[in-house]
Amino acid sequence: MQPQLPPLKPIPIKDRISVLYVERGNLDVLDGAFVVVDKTGVRTHLPVGGVACLMLEPGTRVSHAAVTLASRIGCLLVWIGEAGVRLYASGQPGGARADRLLYQAKLALDDSARLKVVRKMYALRFREEPPERRSVEQLRGIEGVRVRKMYELLARQHGVAWKARNYDHTQWESGDVPNRCLSSATACLYGICEAAILAAGYAPAVGFIHTGKPQSFVYDIADIFKFETVVPVAFRIAAKKPRDPEREVRLACRDAFRQSKILHRIIPTIEQVLAAGGMDVPTPPPESVEAVIPNKEGIGDAGHRG
């Protein structure tokens, strides 16, 4: 009998590259390596085990072997439109667990617990406690007013002409540069947030502020980080009026993600906002599978860097 290969040891989300974009190529596993092959047959190796999210643009084909490997190592594959303006589909990298999903759903279905979670999200986003005796709908309205004012403030700070947050994904090129930059920037953030949510074992669709959409929880979590990361980047790039704003935004977002160490913070933030609901995390049954990206346990004592 042939000896079995040792099990893969996925890299923790916090230690990965945030996002890579692939367009006009074939993703495959050749000679044991995850590669993208262009029309001339040239192979480019992708360190997929160290990437949180691969964004697949038009012209990209993916083999069964590539999808299998991405799933095993916990890399989220997202099929998007050109420049990331639409999300068509995403592949779950095997991280969902019944105990986490039931915990999340229980919080979302309990009105009192849901309100506590929403209030915690508000406090983290705006760095102040929300007004007392407000419903989820009222907090959503207050949040919307504050967000519009923050867009206006950032536009003035960067000298960008601003009307409103509005774009038509069916006529992308007709949109103004600030909105195109914002859409490209938030697409980057949504990708890594969804990858983190799945890696932690939760459901992207079960939201608390946002509801009724496949990525409701993604929007909830992304909104906590949006104005400290991608929104300032989008306005800064828009002020330069580049020829290819989408590409400039992607590169700037990658740098912003690295500098802010956002991948270190997303999963702890998810746990923090859910814990605000005041319900105990259920103990997983003995037969439950391990997380697709388990936390690395050190061999030293508590506090040891190893």
Swiss-Prot record:
Question: Which Pfam family, just one, is annotated for this protein?
Answer: Cas_Cas1
- Names of required cofactors: Mg(2+); Mn(2+)
Q: Name one GO biological process term.
A: CRISPR-cas system
Q: Entry's InterPro entries?
A: Cas1, Cas1_I-E, CRISPR-assoc_Cas1, CRISPR-assoc_Cas1_C, CRISPR-assoc_Cas1_ECOLI, CRISPR-assoc_Cas1_N
Q: What is its EC number?
A: 3.1.-.-
The superkingdom of the source organism is Bacteria
Q: Which GO terms describe its molecular function?
A: DNA binding; DNA endonuclease activity; endonuclease activity; metal ion binding
Record function comment:
CRISPR (clustered regularly interspaced short palindromic repeat), is an adaptive immune system that provides protection against mobile genetic elements (viruses, transposable elements and conjugative plasmids). CRISPR clusters contain spacers, sequences complementary to antecedent mobile elements, and target invading nucleic acids. CRISPR clusters are transcribed and processed into CRISPR RNA (crRNA). Acts as a dsDNA endonuclease. Involved in the integration of spacer DNA into the CRISPR cassette.
Whom does it interact with, and what assembly results? Answer: Homodimer, forms a heterotetramer with a Cas2 homodimer.
Family classification: Belongs to the CRISPR-associated endonuclease Cas1 family.
Q: What PANTHER family does this protein map onto?
A: CRISPR-ASSOCIATED ENDONUCLEASE CAS1 (PTHR34353:SF3), CRISPR-ASSOCIATED ENDONUCLEASE CAS1 1 (PTHR34353)
What's the protein name? Answer: CRISPR-associated endonuclease Cas1
Natural source organism: Geobacter sulfurreducens (strain ATCC 51573 / DSM 12127 / PCA)
Q: What is the lineage of its organism?
A: Bacteria, Pseudomonadati, Thermodesulfobacteriota, Desulfuromonadia, Geobacterales
- Point out the gene that encodes the protein: cas1
